[in-house]
């Protein structure tokens, strides 16, 4: 049982109130095994935990990233997505959980074009090194997105993108957090640009759920201001909305 392991106290608290989103994604044995690994890592290491595994059911690689957030309330998600983008990964789905006051437990399902030419273990270790560097050295330069080379005709003309980007704020569901929903067309490094924009605007991401379907992406963020208050000011909402729309329109390098 978990009680028989010398686990990090924050992990014990996490286990007492395990989010349903994590329970649905794992069998009990797999979840306990992962929690043991995370607990042992957090007990012996001050830095973040990063591990990956090929998920055949999703045709993707699932990365689990766990860290004590400490005083860092802004920019963690942005650094993770930038690290993935720098490695040439496309994020298909993500669940970002804030547990208690200090522990972040994030899961990402990514498409990795290099996996066919590489041993999965070495490739996953390489990606985790980039992620760990980005998180454990928060003052380091943000990883640079990998340049995407496009062949002629591979890029959809802007006229094909018929639906406008939508950015919605919901302050009715919760009184302590704002639900920020975003719907747009996917492109390389998009999530990295979105999360970087939120970080620059001092928007704190408490929870995130990312889904892609064909060429479209739906992002749902539970967010607050730096002081923990919901984002209710209409002018601030408009500033965030305009910045996100500009980030979506940012040309791919």
Segments the model singles out, each with a brief description of its role:
Residues 1-253:
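Regulatory modules associated with amino-acid/nitrogen control
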């Amino acid at each position: 049982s978990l009680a028989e392991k010398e686990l990090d106290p924050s992990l014990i608290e996490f286990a007492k109130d395990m989010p349903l989103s994590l329970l649905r994604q794992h069998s009990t044995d797999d979840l306990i095994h992962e929690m043991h690994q995370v607990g042992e890592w957090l007990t012996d290491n001050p830095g973040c935990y990063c591990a990956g595994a090929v998920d055949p059911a999703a045709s993707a690689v699932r990365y689990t990233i766990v860290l004590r957030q400490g005083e860092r309330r802004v920019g963690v998600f942005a650094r993770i997505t930038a690290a993935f983008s720098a490695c040439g990964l496309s994020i298909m789905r993500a669940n970002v959980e804030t547990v208690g006051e200090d522990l972040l437990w994030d899961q990402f399902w990514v498409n990795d074009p290099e996996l066919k030419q590489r041993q999965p273990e070495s490739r996953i270790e390489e990606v985790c090194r980039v992620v760990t560097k980005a998180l454990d050295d928060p003052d380091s330069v943000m990883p640079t997105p990998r340049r995407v080379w496009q062949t002629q005709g591979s890029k959809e003309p802007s006229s094909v993108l018929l639906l406008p980007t939508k950015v919605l704020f919901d302050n009715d569901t919760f009184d302590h957090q704002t639900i920020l929903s975003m719907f747009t067309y996917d492109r390389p490094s998009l999530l990295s640009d979105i999360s970087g924009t939120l970080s620059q605007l001092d928007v704190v991401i408490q929870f995130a759920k990312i889904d892609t379907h064909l060429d479209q992406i739906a992002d749902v963020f539970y967010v607050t201001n730096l002081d923990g208050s919901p984002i209710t000011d209409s002018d601030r909402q408009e500033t965030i909305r305009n910045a996100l729309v500009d980030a979506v329109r940012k040309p791919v390098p």
